[in-house]
Protein backbone atom coordinates (compact mmCIF):
# COMPACT_ATOMS: atom_id res chain seq x y z
CA UNK A 1 0.00 0.00 0.00
CA UNK A 2 1.32 3.45 -0.91
CA UNK A 3 2.50 5.62 1.97
CA UNK A 4 0.12 8.33 3.09
CA UNK A 5 0.37 11.29 5.44
CA UNK A 6 -1.12 11.27 8.91
CA UNK A 7 -2.83 14.53 9.90
CA UNK A 8 -1.50 17.10 12.32
CA UNK A 9 1.98 15.95 13.24
CA UNK A 10 3.35 18.65 15.49
CA UNK A 11 5.43 19.54 18.48
CA UNK A 12 2.89 19.48 21.27
CA UNK A 13 2.24 22.50 23.47
CA UNK A 14 0.23 20.50 25.98
CA UNK A 15 3.09 18.79 27.78
CA UNK A 16 3.43 19.53 31.46
CA UNK A 17 6.81 18.61 32.92
CA UNK A 18 6.96 18.65 36.69
CA UNK A 19 10.35 18.34 38.36
CA UNK A 20 9.86 17.15 41.92
CA UNK A 21 10.86 19.80 44.43
CA UNK A 22 10.12 18.04 47.65
CA UNK A 23 10.82 14.47 48.57
CA UNK A 24 7.81 12.20 48.25
CA UNK A 25 7.51 9.42 50.77
CA UNK A 26 7.19 5.67 50.49
CA UNK A 27 4.00 3.86 51.57
CA UNK A 28 5.71 2.73 54.78
CA UNK A 29 6.58 6.33 55.67
CA UNK A 30 2.95 7.32 55.11
CA UNK A 31 1.58 4.65 57.46
CA UNK A 32 1.41 6.68 60.71
CA UNK A 33 -0.68 9.49 59.22
CA UNK A 34 -2.73 7.16 57.05
CA UNK A 35 -3.49 4.90 60.01
CA UNK A 36 -1.29 2.19 58.52
CA UNK A 37 -3.44 1.89 55.43
CA UNK A 38 -0.85 0.09 53.31
CA UNK A 39 -1.43 -3.59 52.74
CA UNK A 40 0.14 -5.80 55.39
CA UNK A 41 0.22 -9.50 56.11
CA UNK A 42 -0.06 -12.49 53.88
CA UNK A 43 -2.51 -13.05 51.10
CA UNK A 44 -4.43 -16.27 50.57
CA UNK A 45 -2.46 -19.29 51.69
CA UNK A 46 -4.41 -21.77 49.58
CA UNK A 47 -2.80 -23.58 46.68
CA UNK A 48 -4.09 -22.74 43.23
CA UNK A 49 -6.29 -25.20 41.38
CA UNK A 50 -3.39 -26.58 39.38
CA UNK A 51 -1.03 -27.24 42.34
CA UNK A 52 1.37 -24.37 41.72
CA UNK A 53 4.59 -24.59 43.71
CA UNK A 54 4.13 -21.31 45.59
CA UNK A 55 1.57 -18.64 46.31
CA UNK A 56 2.96 -15.12 46.62
CA UNK A 57 2.61 -12.94 49.70
CA UNK A 58 0.52 -9.77 49.53
CA UNK A 59 2.50 -7.77 52.10
CA UNK A 60 5.90 -6.13 51.48
CA UNK A 61 8.89 -8.09 52.74
CA UNK A 62 11.76 -6.73 54.84
CA UNK A 63 14.90 -6.81 52.72
CA UNK A 64 18.01 -8.41 54.23
CA UNK A 65 21.11 -6.22 54.53
CA UNK A 66 22.74 -5.65 51.17
CA UNK A 67 25.91 -7.67 50.65
CA UNK A 68 28.99 -6.24 48.96
CA UNK A 69 28.71 -6.81 45.20
CA UNK A 70 32.47 -6.39 44.80
CA UNK A 71 33.09 -9.12 47.36
CA UNK A 72 30.53 -11.42 45.70
CA UNK A 73 32.15 -10.92 42.28
CA UNK A 74 35.57 -11.63 43.77
CA UNK A 75 34.26 -14.83 45.38
CA UNK A 76 32.82 -15.84 41.99
CA UNK A 77 36.16 -15.20 40.30
CA UNK A 78 37.84 -17.47 42.85
CA UNK A 79 35.23 -20.16 42.25
CA UNK A 80 33.69 -19.78 45.69
CA UNK A 81 30.38 -18.30 44.57
CA UNK A 82 28.04 -19.50 41.83
CA UNK A 83 26.75 -17.20 39.12
CA UNK A 84 23.14 -17.42 40.44
CA UNK A 85 24.38 -16.09 43.78
CA UNK A 86 26.01 -13.17 41.94
CA UNK A 87 22.73 -12.46 40.15
CA UNK A 88 20.87 -12.63 43.44
CA UNK A 89 23.30 -10.16 44.98
CA UNK A 90 22.85 -7.74 42.09
CA UNK A 91 19.07 -8.02 42.37
CA UNK A 92 19.19 -7.45 46.13
CA UNK A 93 21.31 -4.34 45.60
CA UNK A 94 18.81 -3.02 43.04
CA UNK A 95 15.89 -3.61 45.39
CA UNK A 96 17.60 -1.48 48.02
CA UNK A 97 17.91 1.38 45.50
CA UNK A 98 14.18 1.18 44.70
CA UNK A 99 13.47 2.69 48.10
CA UNK A 100 14.94 5.96 46.81
CA UNK A 101 12.89 6.01 43.58
CA UNK A 102 10.81 9.16 43.17
CA UNK A 103 8.96 10.79 40.28
CA UNK A 104 11.65 12.45 38.16
CA UNK A 105 9.30 14.01 35.61
CA UNK A 106 5.63 13.99 34.75
CA UNK A 107 3.75 14.74 31.52
CA UNK A 108 0.06 15.16 30.72
CA UNK A 109 -0.02 15.35 26.91
CA UNK A 110 -3.35 13.70 26.08
CA UNK A 111 -7.04 14.58 26.33
CA UNK A 112 -7.80 10.87 26.79
CA UNK A 113 -6.09 8.23 28.93
CA UNK A 114 -2.82 6.57 27.94
CA UNK A 115 -3.33 3.05 26.57
CA UNK A 116 0.09 1.81 25.45
CA UNK A 117 3.74 2.38 26.25
CA UNK A 118 7.08 1.39 24.67
CA UNK A 119 10.67 2.21 25.57
CA UNK A 120 13.19 3.07 22.86
CA UNK A 121 15.45 -0.01 22.55
CA UNK A 122 18.74 1.95 22.65
CA UNK A 123 17.97 5.39 24.15
CA UNK A 124 17.28 4.84 27.87
CA UNK A 125 15.59 8.25 28.31
CA UNK A 126 13.18 8.00 25.36
CA UNK A 127 9.69 6.54 25.60
CA UNK A 128 6.72 6.40 23.21
CA UNK A 129 3.16 6.50 24.54
CA UNK A 130 -0.19 6.03 22.79
CA UNK A 131 -3.60 7.26 23.91
CA UNK A 132 -7.25 6.30 23.67
CA UNK A 133 -7.73 9.08 21.13
CA UNK A 134 -5.02 7.71 18.83
CA UNK A 135 -2.43 10.34 19.82
CA UNK A 136 1.20 9.20 20.02
CA UNK A 137 3.96 11.00 21.92
CA UNK A 138 7.70 10.44 21.57
CA UNK A 139 9.30 11.84 24.71
CA UNK A 140 13.00 12.18 25.46
CA UNK A 141 12.77 13.33 29.07
CA UNK A 142 16.56 13.69 29.25
CA UNK A 143 16.46 16.94 27.24
CA UNK A 144 14.40 20.10 27.51
CA UNK A 145 12.96 19.99 23.98
CA UNK A 146 9.23 19.46 23.75
CA UNK A 147 8.16 15.89 22.90
CA UNK A 148 7.13 15.00 19.37
CA UNK A 149 3.35 14.64 19.13
CA UNK A 150 1.28 12.87 16.47
CA UNK A 151 -2.39 13.79 16.63
CA UNK A 152 -4.88 10.90 16.46
CA UNK A 153 -8.42 10.75 15.13
CA UNK A 154 -10.04 11.07 18.57
CA UNK A 155 -12.88 8.76 19.56
CA UNK A 156 -12.39 5.27 18.13
CA UNK A 157 -8.66 5.68 17.51
CA UNK A 158 -7.27 4.03 20.65
CA UNK A 159 -3.68 2.77 20.30
CA UNK A 160 -3.80 -0.79 21.64
CA UNK A 161 -0.23 -1.85 20.86
CA UNK A 162 3.00 0.07 20.29
CA UNK A 163 6.46 -1.23 19.32
CA UNK A 164 9.56 0.49 17.98
CA UNK A 165 10.74 -0.92 14.67
CA UNK A 166 13.82 -2.94 15.75
CA UNK A 167 15.38 -2.42 12.31
CA UNK A 168 14.83 1.36 12.25
CA UNK A 169 14.01 3.06 15.54
CA UNK A 170 12.79 6.21 13.77
CA UNK A 171 9.71 4.14 12.97
CA UNK A 172 7.16 2.26 15.05
CA UNK A 173 4.42 -0.34 14.71
CA UNK A 174 0.97 0.42 16.11
CA UNK A 175 -2.28 -1.53 16.39
CA UNK A 176 -5.45 0.45 16.96
CA UNK A 177 -9.20 0.49 17.30
CA UNK A 178 -9.15 2.47 14.06
CA UNK A 179 -9.00 -0.97 12.45
CA UNK A 180 -5.36 -1.17 11.37
CA UNK A 181 -1.98 -2.52 12.37
CA UNK A 182 0.54 -0.27 10.67
CA UNK A 183 4.13 0.90 10.40
CA UNK A 184 4.69 4.65 10.54
CA UNK A 185 7.35 7.21 11.37
CA UNK A 186 7.39 9.99 13.93
CA UNK A 187 6.71 12.57 11.22
CA UNK A 188 3.24 11.10 10.88
CA UNK A 189 3.74 9.16 7.64
CA UNK A 190 2.09 5.75 7.36
CA UNK A 191 4.72 3.59 5.66
CA UNK A 192 2.80 0.33 5.43
CA UNK A 193 -0.54 -1.07 6.57
CA UNK A 194 0.02 -4.68 7.68
CA UNK A 195 -3.58 -5.48 8.56
CA UNK A 196 -6.86 -3.68 8.01
CA UNK A 197 -10.34 -4.75 9.05
CA UNK A 198 -12.29 -2.44 6.70
CA UNK A 199 -15.18 -2.48 9.18
CA UNK A 200 -15.97 -0.61 12.39
CA UNK A 201 -16.96 -3.86 14.12
CA UNK A 202 -13.47 -5.39 14.05
CA UNK A 203 -10.31 -3.75 15.38
CA UNK A 204 -6.83 -4.79 16.46
CA UNK A 205 -6.03 -5.20 20.15
CA UNK A 206 -2.46 -6.51 20.35
CA UNK A 207 0.86 -6.48 18.56
CA UNK A 208 4.40 -7.88 18.71
CA UNK A 209 7.45 -7.77 16.45
CA UNK A 210 10.57 -9.95 16.12
CA UNK A 211 13.75 -8.54 14.56
CA UNK A 212 15.55 -11.88 14.20
CA UNK A 213 12.69 -13.69 12.46
CA UNK A 214 11.39 -10.47 10.82
CA UNK A 215 7.85 -11.31 11.85
CA UNK A 216 4.87 -9.16 12.86
CA UNK A 217 1.94 -10.68 14.75
CA UNK A 218 -1.33 -8.97 15.64
CA UNK A 219 -4.63 -10.02 17.24
CA UNK A 220 -8.16 -8.62 16.91
CA UNK A 221 -11.32 -8.31 19.00
CA UNK A 222 -13.02 -11.45 17.66
CA UNK A 223 -10.20 -13.93 18.32
CA UNK A 224 -8.22 -13.82 15.08
CA UNK A 225 -4.41 -13.74 15.00
CA UNK A 226 -2.50 -12.68 11.88
CA UNK A 227 1.15 -13.51 11.21
CA UNK A 228 3.04 -11.46 8.61
CA UNK A 229 6.62 -10.90 7.57
CA UNK A 230 8.13 -7.41 7.72
CA UNK A 231 7.52 -6.95 4.00
CA UNK A 232 3.80 -7.08 4.73
CA UNK A 233 3.16 -10.55 3.30
CA UNK A 234 0.45 -12.38 5.25
CA UNK A 235 1.58 -15.89 6.25
CA UNK A 236 -1.66 -16.92 7.94
CA UNK A 237 -4.83 -15.47 9.44
CA UNK A 238 -6.57 -17.84 11.85
CA UNK A 239 -9.16 -17.67 14.60
CA UNK A 240 -7.17 -18.87 17.61
CA UNK A 241 -9.51 -17.76 20.41
CA UNK A 242 -13.25 -17.52 20.92
CA UNK A 243 -13.06 -13.86 21.97
CA UNK A 244 -10.82 -10.78 21.90
CA UNK A 245 -7.06 -11.41 21.75
CA UNK A 246 -5.77 -8.99 24.38
CA UNK A 247 -2.07 -9.79 24.07
CA UNK A 248 0.37 -11.52 21.72
CA UNK A 249 4.02 -12.17 22.62
CA UNK A 250 6.86 -13.70 20.61
CA UNK A 251 9.48 -15.45 22.72
CA UNK A 252 12.67 -13.31 22.77
CA UNK A 253 14.96 -16.35 22.61
CA UNK A 254 12.92 -18.73 20.45
CA UNK A 255 11.37 -16.97 17.46
CA UNK A 256 8.86 -19.67 16.61
CA UNK A 257 7.32 -19.65 20.11
CA UNK A 258 4.16 -17.52 20.44
CA UNK A 259 1.88 -16.82 23.41
CA UNK A 260 -1.63 -15.39 23.00
CA UNK A 261 -3.96 -14.17 25.76
CA UNK A 262 -7.70 -13.65 25.50
CA UNK A 263 -10.83 -12.63 27.36
CA UNK A 264 -12.01 -16.21 26.75
CA UNK A 265 -10.05 -16.98 29.96
CA UNK A 266 -7.20 -18.81 28.27
CA UNK A 267 -3.58 -18.27 27.36
CA UNK A 268 -2.31 -20.44 24.51
CA UNK A 269 1.23 -21.29 23.45
CA UNK A 270 1.92 -22.02 19.78
CA UNK A 271 4.71 -23.31 17.56
CA UNK A 272 4.57 -20.96 14.55
CA UNK A 273 6.06 -23.69 12.36
CA UNK A 274 3.14 -26.02 13.06
CA UNK A 275 0.08 -23.76 13.21
CA UNK A 276 -2.72 -25.29 11.15
CA UNK A 277 -5.81 -24.08 13.00
CA UNK A 278 -7.26 -23.16 16.36
CA UNK A 279 -6.67 -26.68 17.75
CA UNK A 280 -2.95 -26.82 16.88
CA UNK A 281 -1.69 -25.07 20.03
CA UNK A 282 1.05 -26.67 22.12
CA UNK A 283 -0.50 -25.72 25.47
CA UNK A 284 -3.73 -24.13 26.63
CA UNK A 285 -3.51 -22.47 30.05
CA UNK A 286 -6.98 -21.96 31.55
CA UNK A 287 -7.57 -19.03 33.93
CA UNK A 288 -10.43 -18.19 36.28
CA UNK A 289 -11.03 -14.82 34.64
CA UNK A 290 -10.36 -13.05 31.31
CA UNK A 291 -6.65 -12.40 30.75
CA UNK A 292 -5.10 -8.99 30.05
CA UNK A 293 -1.54 -10.01 29.23
CA UNK A 294 0.94 -12.85 28.75
CA UNK A 295 4.61 -11.81 28.67
CA UNK A 296 7.73 -13.91 28.29
CA UNK A 297 10.64 -13.17 30.61
CA UNK A 298 13.77 -11.65 29.00
CA UNK A 299 15.45 -15.08 28.94
CA UNK A 300 12.33 -16.65 27.41
CA UNK A 301 12.14 -19.31 30.13
CA UNK A 302 9.07 -17.99 31.97
CA UNK A 303 5.65 -16.62 31.13
CA UNK A 304 3.88 -13.97 33.20
CA UNK A 305 0.09 -13.67 32.95
CA UNK A 306 -2.26 -11.01 34.35
CA UNK A 307 -5.98 -11.67 34.61
CA UNK A 308 -8.79 -9.11 34.96
CA UNK A 309 -9.43 -9.77 38.63
CA UNK A 310 -6.83 -10.69 41.23
CA UNK A 311 -4.29 -13.23 39.95
CA UNK A 312 -0.82 -12.93 38.51
CA UNK A 313 0.64 -16.25 37.39
CA UNK A 314 4.17 -17.37 36.56
CA UNK A 315 4.68 -20.35 34.25
CA UNK A 316 8.01 -22.07 33.60
CA UNK A 317 9.37 -23.66 30.42
CA UNK A 318 9.99 -26.84 32.41
CA UNK A 319 6.21 -27.33 32.65
CA UNK A 320 4.19 -24.84 30.62
CA UNK A 321 0.84 -26.44 31.39
CA UNK A 322 1.08 -25.93 35.17
CA UNK A 323 1.79 -22.56 36.84
CA UNK A 324 4.98 -22.36 38.85
CA UNK A 325 3.30 -19.88 41.17
CA UNK A 326 0.35 -17.62 41.84
CA UNK A 327 0.48 -14.06 43.17
CA UNK A 328 -2.81 -12.77 44.64
CA UNK A 329 -3.03 -9.10 43.64
CA UNK A 330 -5.94 -6.64 43.18
CA UNK A 331 -6.14 -5.23 39.62
CA UNK A 332 -9.76 -5.75 38.61
CA UNK A 333 -11.17 -4.68 35.25
CA UNK A 334 -13.03 -1.40 34.87
CA UNK A 335 -14.44 -0.12 31.58
CA UNK A 336 -12.87 3.34 31.79
CA UNK A 337 -9.48 2.17 33.06
CA UNK A 338 -6.63 1.02 30.84
CA UNK A 339 -6.27 -2.72 31.58
CA UNK A 340 -3.59 -3.38 34.18
CA UNK A 341 -0.70 -5.52 32.94
CA UNK A 342 2.18 -6.91 34.96
CA UNK A 343 5.63 -6.71 33.35
CA UNK A 344 9.09 -8.22 33.87
CA UNK A 345 12.14 -6.23 34.85
CA UNK A 346 14.57 -6.46 31.88
CA UNK A 347 17.58 -7.55 33.97
CA UNK A 348 16.34 -9.09 37.20
CA UNK A 349 13.75 -11.70 38.08
CA UNK A 350 11.28 -9.08 39.27
CA UNK A 351 7.67 -8.30 38.37
CA UNK A 352 6.16 -4.79 38.41
CA UNK A 353 2.40 -4.11 38.42
CA UNK A 354 -0.03 -1.35 39.41
CA UNK A 355 -2.48 -1.92 42.29
CA UNK A 356 -6.22 -1.19 42.09
CA UNK A 357 -7.42 -1.76 45.68
CA UNK A 358 -10.49 -3.99 45.87
CA UNK A 359 -12.68 -4.11 49.01
CA UNK A 360 -13.54 -7.72 48.13
CA UNK A 361 -9.88 -8.76 48.00
CA UNK A 362 -9.00 -10.99 50.96
CA UNK A 363 -6.11 -8.94 52.36
CA UNK A 364 -7.56 -5.50 51.53
CA UNK A 365 -7.49 -2.83 54.24
CA UNK A 366 -9.64 0.34 54.33
CA UNK A 367 -8.23 3.22 52.27
CA UNK A 368 -5.53 1.04 50.78
CA UNK A 369 -3.04 3.02 48.69
CA UNK A 370 -2.84 2.75 44.89
CA UNK A 371 0.77 1.69 44.78
CA UNK A 372 3.08 0.24 42.16
CA UNK A 373 4.08 -3.18 43.47
CA UNK A 374 7.32 -5.06 42.80
CA UNK A 375 7.38 -8.85 43.32
CA UNK A 376 10.15 -11.42 43.33
CA UNK A 377 9.63 -13.65 40.29
CA UNK A 378 11.05 -16.69 42.11
CA UNK A 379 9.13 -16.60 45.38
CA UNK A 380 6.16 -14.37 44.56
CA UNK A 381 6.93 -12.19 47.58
CA UNK A 382 6.26 -8.47 47.40
CA UNK A 383 9.63 -6.73 47.69
CA UNK A 384 8.77 -3.05 47.31
CA UNK A 385 5.95 -0.55 46.76
CA UNK A 386 6.27 2.81 45.00
CA UNK A 387 3.87 5.62 45.85
CA UNK A 388 3.65 9.39 45.44
CA UNK A 389 0.85 11.17 47.36
CA UNK A 390 0.73 13.88 44.67
CA UNK A 391 0.17 11.29 41.92
CA UNK A 392 -2.11 8.82 43.63
CA UNK A 393 -4.07 7.43 40.68
CA UNK A 394 -4.02 3.88 39.35
CA UNK A 395 -0.90 3.07 37.32
CA UNK A 396 -2.19 0.66 34.69
CA UNK A 397 1.04 0.25 32.72
CA UNK A 398 4.49 0.11 34.32
CA UNK A 399 7.66 -0.75 32.42
CA UNK A 400 11.36 -0.38 33.13
CA UNK A 401 13.64 0.89 30.36
CA UNK A 402 16.06 -1.62 28.77
CA UNK A 403 18.82 -0.65 31.23
CA UNK A 404 16.42 -1.36 34.09
CA UNK A 405 17.15 1.83 36.05
CA UNK A 406 14.14 4.00 35.09
CA UNK A 407 10.43 3.18 35.33
CA UNK A 408 7.68 4.67 33.15
CA UNK A 409 4.08 4.53 34.38
CA UNK A 410 0.83 5.32 32.58
CA UNK A 411 -1.64 6.72 35.11
CA UNK A 412 -4.82 7.92 33.44
CA UNK A 413 -3.91 11.00 31.37
CA UNK A 414 -0.45 11.19 32.93
CA UNK A 415 2.93 9.67 32.17
CA UNK A 416 5.24 9.34 35.18
CA UNK A 417 8.99 8.78 35.06
CA UNK A 418 10.43 7.20 38.22
CA UNK A 419 14.14 7.15 38.99
CA UNK A 420 16.56 7.36 41.89
CA UNK A 421 16.37 10.60 43.85
CA UNK A 422 20.10 11.13 43.22
CA UNK A 423 19.44 11.13 39.45
CA UNK A 424 17.10 14.10 39.84
CA UNK A 425 19.72 15.94 41.90
CA UNK A 426 22.32 15.46 39.15
CA UNK A 427 19.95 16.97 36.61
UniProtKB/Swiss-Prot annotation:
Q: Where is the composition biased (Basic and acidic residues)?
A: 1-11
Induction info reads: Expression is induced in response to treatment with IR or UV and this requires p53/TP53 activity.
Report what the Swiss-Prot or TrEMBL entry states about this protein's PTMs: Phosphorylation by ABL1 negatively regulate UV-DDB activity.
Where in this protein would one find the motif DWD box, according to its record?
256-274
GO CC, alphabetical: cell junction; chromatin; Cul4-RING E3 ubiquitin ligase complex; Cul4A-RING E3 ubiquitin ligase complex; Cul4B-RING E3 ubiquitin ligase complex; nucleoplasm; nucleus; protein-containing complex
Q: Where is this region: Disordered?
A: 1-30
* Family annotation (Pfam families): WD40
Where, in residue numbers, are the WD repeats? 116-151, 159-194, 203-238, 244-287, 290-329, 343-386, 396-420
Oligomer status and interactors: Component of the UV-DDB complex which includes DDB1 and DDB2. The UV-DDB complex interacts with monoubiquitinated histone H2A and binds to XPC via the DDB2 subunit. Component of the DCX (DDB1-CUL4-X-box) E3 ubiquitin-protein ligase complex DDB1-CUL4-ROC1 (also known as CUL4-DDB-ROC1 and CUL4-DDB-RBX1), which includes CUL4A or CUL4B, DDB1, DDB2 and RBX1. DDB2 may function as the substrate recognition module within this complex. The DDB1-CUL4-ROC1 complex may associate with the COP9 signalosome, and this inhibits the E3 ubiquitin-protein ligase activity of the complex.
Under what name is this protein listed? Answer: DNA damage-binding protein 2
**Species this chain originates from:** Homo sapiens
Amino acid sequence: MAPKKRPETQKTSEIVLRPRNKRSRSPLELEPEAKKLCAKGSGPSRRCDSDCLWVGLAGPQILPPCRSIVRTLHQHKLGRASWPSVQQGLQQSFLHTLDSYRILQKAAPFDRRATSLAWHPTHPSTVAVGSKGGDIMLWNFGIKDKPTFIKGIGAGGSITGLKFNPLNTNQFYASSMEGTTRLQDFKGNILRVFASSDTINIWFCSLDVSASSRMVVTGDNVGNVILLNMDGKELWNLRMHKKKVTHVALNPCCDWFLATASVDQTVKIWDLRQVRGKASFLYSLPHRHPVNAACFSPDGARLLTTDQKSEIRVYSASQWDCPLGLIPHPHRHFQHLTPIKAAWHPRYNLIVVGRYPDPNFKSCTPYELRTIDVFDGNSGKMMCQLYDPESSGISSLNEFNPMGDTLASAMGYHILIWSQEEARTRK
